[in-house]
């Protein structure tokens, strides 16, 4: 950058006969931000140009040809000649009225200046700051007052070092002022430091045209370009001002390389460049690749993925011989096969309105072994038997029927128990059913009195006297059952259940461990124990009903 400065402002004045000032450590030109006074914080410290994150340096001068007492004043002037006093101020230790002034150490000739910061002023306070420079005689190059009015570049300043020493006679001797390199405000995009932060890819085809997204610090879209340089070759990326996003991102296409028939990868430098001051950023490496059909680098990505997978498998603790695992245990899941037949849904039994519609020819007698008759009868007997009457007294009407000899009950020969097989009745017409099923579906409330239910009804349309009930049809049904029993000489259905037969014959059943709830008479059926009926056919129902009504 030294070739950009005029030779009339040398940093080392040609004075062979006397002392002179030399800047041995220039201030860092970019990367520092000027602070406003209203920010209420320190303006920082001006670093040296060789300053790093680990090694800090500061602006340093050397007084050649002199050792002894003296003073130094450091002030801010404009970047371009004539070097007028700048409205910005130096702040820090030993600073006043916008400049720094201190005594030099007489024992050394090299002096470093730390804790110097630059504080900027607002545009509305510009005239006031210039007037203050004139009043304090802060004008190193004695620029006339009328020339101090005008525009100022508020984004760039220079440090001016003014040193005063003693001559051999002890009188003050002012040495020639020395100017530093320009210092730019990092906040201004037209003077800020150029820096490439990140790119989405750092390689492309030698034919060019690859789209690249570049992130950077603040730039001006009309004063920025992407610069490619290589051995004997330079080019610029292709983009427009619309491709600069909010001054921090640039989308451009790579230029073609000088040799389109490239056979091996070539590395070049990629930089940001500001045409106004020819400022360049730190270079970033970019690689041009030979032109192939695989423009999207599928094979390269596949190879990289495969190598990564292999390295992971080598480091895996599960990589190695393992014992064979037993076959997985199968869990039995119930399933309905195609040959399985679903069970038919139970159908409600429809009873006929009259007993005369029942066909007794369809019924077959129920045969049980002698030892199982009482048990089966007890199992079929309900727990709560209906109470027929509160008091059961035999009347004279029932004496003839009781005097008749009981019908013989067929006894089977002892043998192995036979399983009950209910024959499937043939349905003759709708509404027909077996008498046994009809009797099983009859339900009575054990807590209600049948006589009370019949006697308490005041409806004239209902039977008021049980003697008026016509039981001739039911008597004919019973006689038909007796005739069938004598003709076939086989036990008939009407001889059961066995509980009624036991009551008729007067046989006593051994007591059960948990007897059922008894009726009023002390027996499950509400009958006395001395009543003997060998069959339900021998019972005189007319006398029984008249007994209940009385």
Swiss-Prot record:
InterPro entries xref list: Ig-like_fold, Ig_E-set, IPT_dom, IPT_NFkappaB, NFkB/Dor, p53-like_TF_DNA-bd_sf, RelA_RHD_N, RHD_CS
Function: NF-kappa-B is a pleiotropic transcription factor present in almost all cell types and is the endpoint of a series of signal transduction events that are initiated by a vast array of stimuli related to many biological processes such as inflammation, immunity, differentiation, cell growth, tumorigenesis and apoptosis. NF-kappa-B is a homo- or heterodimeric complex formed by the Rel-like domain-containing proteins RELA/p65, RELB, NFKB1/p105, NFKB1/p50, REL and NFKB2/p52. The heterodimeric RELA-NFKB1 complex appears to be most abundant one.
Residues modified as Phosphothreonine: 254, 434, 505
UniProt GO cellular component terms: chromatin; cytoplasm; cytosol; glutamatergic synapse; NF-kappaB complex; NF-kappaB p50/p65 complex; nucleus; protein-containing complex
Protein name, entry field: Transcription factor p65
Positions of post-translational N6-methyllysine modification: 310
Subcellular location: Nucleus; Cytoplasm
Motif (9aaTAD): 535-543
Annotated segments matching region Transcriptional activation domain 3: 342-388
One term of GO molecular function: chromatin binding
Domain remark in the UniProt entry: The transcriptional activation domain 3/TA3 does not participate in the direct transcriptional activity of RELA but is involved in the control by RELA of the accessibility of target gene promoters. Mediates interaction with ZBTB7A.
Subunit structure of this chain's protein: Component of the NF-kappa-B p65-p50 complex. Component of the NF-kappa-B p65-c-Rel complex. Homodimer; component of the NF-kappa-B p65-p65 complex. Component of the NF-kappa-B p65-p52 complex. May interact with ETHE1. Binds TLE5 and TLE1. Interacts with TP53BP2. Binds to and is phosphorylated by the activated form of either RPS6KA4 or RPS6KA5. Interacts with ING4 and this interaction may be indirect. Interacts with CARM1, USP48 and UNC5CL. Interacts with IRAK1BP1. Interacts with NFKBID. Interacts with NFKBIA. Interacts with GSK3B. Interacts with NFKBIB. Interacts with NFKBIE.
UniProt record, GO biological process: animal organ morphogenesis; antiviral innate immune response; canonical NF-kappaB signal transduction; cellular response to angiotensin; cellular response to hepatocyte growth factor stimulus; cellular response to hydrogen peroxide; cellular response to interleukin-1; cellular response to interleukin-6
Annotated ranges, domain RHD: 16-190
Post-translational modification remark: Ubiquitinated by RNF182, leading to its proteasomal degradation. Degradation is required for termination of NF-kappa-B response. Polyubiquitinated via 'Lys-29'-linked ubiquitin; leading to lysosomal degradation.
Chain intervals for the UniProt region annotation (Transcriptional activation domain 2): 520-550
Sequence segments annotated as region (Transcriptional activation domain 1): 414-476
Residues found modified as Cysteine persulfide: 38
Origin: domain of life: Eukaryota
S-nitrosocysteine PTM sites in chain numbering: 38
UniProt KW keywords: Acetylation, Cytoplasm, Isopeptide bond, Methylation, Nucleus, Phosphoprotein, S-nitrosylation, Transcription, Transcription regulation, Ubl conjugation
PTM annotation (N6-acetyllysine): residues: 122-123, 218, 221, 310
Residues with Phosphoserine modification: 276, 281, 311, 468, 535
Motif stretch (Nuclear localization signal): 301-304
């Amino acid at each position: 950058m030294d070739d950009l400065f005029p030779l009339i402002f040398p940093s080392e004045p040609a004075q062979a006969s006397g002392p002179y000032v030399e800047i041995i450590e220039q201030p860092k030109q970019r990367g520092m931000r000027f602070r406003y006074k209203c920010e209420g914080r320190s303006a920082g410290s001006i670093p040296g140009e060789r300053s790093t994150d680990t090694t800090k340096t500061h602006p340093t001068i050397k007084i050649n040809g002199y050792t002894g007492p003296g003073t130094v004043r450091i002030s801010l002037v404009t970047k371009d000649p004539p070097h007028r006093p700048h409205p910005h101020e130096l702040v820090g230790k030993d600073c006043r009225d916008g400049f720094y002034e201190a005594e030099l150490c007489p024992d050394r000739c090299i002096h470093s200046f730390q804790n110097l910061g630059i504080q900027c002023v607002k545009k509305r306070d510009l005239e006031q700051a210039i007037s203050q420079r004139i009043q304090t005689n802060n004008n190193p190059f004695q620029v006339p007052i009328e020339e101090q009015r005008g525009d100022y570049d508020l984004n760039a300043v220079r440090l001016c070092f003014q040193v005063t020493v003693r001559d051999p006679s002890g009188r003050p001797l002012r040495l020639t002022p020395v100017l530093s390199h320009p210092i730019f405000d990092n906040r201004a995009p037209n003077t800020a430091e150029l820096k490439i932060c990140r790119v989405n890819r750092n390689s492309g085809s030698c034919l060019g045209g690859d789209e690249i997204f570049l992130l950077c610090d603040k730039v001006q879209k009309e004063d920025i370009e992407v610069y490619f340089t290589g051995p004997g070759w330079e080019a610029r990326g292709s983009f427009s001002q619309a491709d600069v996003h909010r001054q921090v991102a640039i989308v451009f296409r790579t230029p073609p390389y000088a040799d389109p028939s490239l056979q091996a990868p070539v590395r070049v430098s990629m930089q940001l460049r500001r045409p106004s001051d020819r400022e360049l950023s730190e270079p970033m490496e970019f690689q041009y690749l030979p032109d192939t059909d695989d423009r999207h680098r599928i094979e390269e990505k596949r190879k990289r993925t495969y190598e990564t997978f292999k390295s992971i498998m080598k480091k895996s603790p599960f990589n190695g011989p393992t014992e064979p695992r037993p076959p997985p245990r199968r869990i039995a899941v119930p399933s309905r096969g195609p040959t399985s037949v679903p069970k038919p849904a139970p159908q409600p039994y429809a009873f006929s309105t009259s007993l005369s519609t029942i066909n007794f020819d369809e019924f077959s007698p129920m045969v049980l072994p002698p030892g199982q008759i009482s048990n089966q009868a007890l199992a079929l007997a309900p727990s709560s038997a209906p109470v027929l009457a509160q008091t059961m007294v035999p009347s004279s009407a029932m004496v003839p029927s009781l005097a008749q000899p009981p019908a013989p009950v067929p006894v089977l020969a002892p043998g192995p128990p036979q399983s009950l097989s209910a024959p499937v009745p043939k349905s003759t017409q709708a509404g027909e059913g077996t008498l046994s099923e009809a009797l099983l579906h009859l339900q009575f409330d054990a807590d209600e009195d049948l006589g009370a239910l019949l006697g308490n009804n005041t409806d004239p349309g209902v039977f008021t006297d049980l003697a008026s009930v016509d039981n001739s049809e039911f008597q004919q049904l019973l006689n038909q059952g007796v005739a069938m029993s004598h003709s076939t000489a086989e036990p008939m259905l009407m001889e059961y259940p066995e509980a009624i037969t036991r009551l008729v014959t007067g046989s006593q059943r051994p007591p059960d461990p948990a007897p059922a709830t008894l009726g009023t008479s002390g027996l499950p059926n509400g009958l006395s124990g001395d009543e003997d009926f060998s069959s339900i056919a021998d019972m005189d129902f007319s006398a029984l009903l008249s007994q209940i009504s009385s």
